[in-house]
UniProtKB/Swiss-Prot annotation:
Keywords: Cell membrane, Chaperone, Membrane, Protein transport, Transmembrane, Transmembrane helix, Transport. The chain crosses the membrane at residues 7-23. Belongs to the OXA1/ALB3/YidC family. Type 1 subfamily. Residues 42-53 have a biased composition (Polar residues). The keyword Transport applies. This is Membrane protein insertase YidC. Residues 34-53 are annotated as: Disordered. GO terms for cellular component: plasma membrane. Signal peptide: none annotated. InterPro entries: Membr_insert_YidC_N, YidC/ALB3/OXA1/COX18, YidC_periplasmic_sf. The gene is yidC. One of its GO terms (molecular function) is membrane insertase activity. It is found in: Cell membrane.
C-alpha cells in the first residue's frame, strides 16, 4: 500500500511539473547531460572529466562490431558503446541509411555506458582504457554468437576482461566480466549500467516539442525494499 501511494505521489509531481512547464512559456535550453539509470549498487561515475587509466602505452580507440542487425562503435575507454546503427531499420522512408540509435558527436551525446564501480572497481575514479586483439569484429554467416573481449590490467596486476556478447538476429547486448586477482586482497565491486544523453537535441532528433524536459523522459520505474525494480508505462500511471 505504501508503495502504491509513493508511486501515485511521484506521478502527481511529474504531471504538476509538466503543467508548470507549459504555463511558464519561456523555455530555457540547457547544455547539460542527463543519465538514465539501469542498475546501481554504489555511486556511479558522475563526470566525464574523470582521469583516464590505461594499460601501458595504450591509447583509446573505436572498435567496430557488426552483426546481421547491428553496427556498433565501442570505445576502448571504459568500453562505452558510442554508436549503434539498426541495420534493418532505415533512417527515413525509402532510405538506404540505417537508423542511428546511439551516437557521439561534439554537439550531441547518446551512449550506453557500463562498468565496475565500488572500492576496487576500475571505473570508480577513472575510465580504464582496455586493449582489444582486433580493430573489427564481424559475425560470420555460419555464426550464431559473436564475443568481443577487451582487457585491462590495473597497477596491482588485477586483470579485467570485459566481453560484449551479441547474437544473430538479436538487438540485446550481453556484457560479461571476468576478474583475475593475483593478490591476497579481497576485491569489492559492483556492476553499473546507464544510458547517457544530452538534453539539447540536434535538429534530426528533435520531435518538435517545445518542452525540453520531454525529450529525455522514457517512462517511470519504481522499486522499494519489498518490491523489485518495475517499469510502468504511461497507461499504468
Amino acid at each position: 500500500m505504501d508503495s502504491q501511494r509513493n508511486l501515485l505521489f511521484i506521478a502527481l509531481l511529474f504531471v504538476s511539473f509538466l503543467i508548470w512547464q507549459q504555463w511558464e512559456g519561456d523555455k530555457v535550453s540547457q547544455n547539460t547531460t542527463t543519465t538514465t539509470q539501469v542498475s546501481q549498487q554504489a555511486d556511479m561515475p558522475s563526470s566525464d572529466s574523470l582521469a583516464v587509466t590505461g594499460n601501458s602505452n595504450e591509447q583509446a580507440k573505436l572498435i567496430t562490431v557488426k552483426t546481421d542487425v547491428l553496427d556498433l562503435r565501442i570505445n576502448t575507454q571504459g568500453g562505452t558503446i558510442d554508436e549503434a546503427d539498426l541495420l534493418a531499420y532505415p533512417a527515413e522512408l525509402n532510405s538506404k541509411t540505417p537508423f542511428r540509435l546511439l551516437e557521439t558527436t561534439p554537439q550531441f551525446l547518446y551512449q550506453a555506458q557500463s562498468g565496475l564501480i565500488g572500492p576496487d572497481g576500475p571505473d570508480q575514479k577513472s575510465r580504464p582504457v582496455y586493449s582489444a586483439t582486433q580493430q573489427e569484429f564481424i559475425l560470420g554467416e555460419n555464426q550464431d554468437e559473436l564475443r568481443v573481449p577487451m582487457t585491462f590490467v590495473n597497477e596491482e596486476g588485477v586483470k579485467f576482461v570485459k566481453t560484449f556478447i551479441l547474437k544473430k538476429g538479436q538487438y540485446d547486448i550481453g556484457i560479461e566480466y571476468k576478474v583475475e586477482n593475483p593478490t591476497d586482497k579481497t576485491l569489492t565491486m559492483n556492476f553499473y549500467g546507464q544510458l547517457k544523453q544530452s538534453v539539447k537535441l540536434p535538429e534530426h532528433r528533435d520531435t518538435g516539442s517545445s518542452n525540453f524536459a520531454l525529450h529525455t523522459y522514457r517512462g517511470a520505474a519504481y522499486s522499494s525494499d519489498e518490491t523489485n525494480y518495475k517499469k510502468y508505462s504511461f497507461g499504468d500511471i
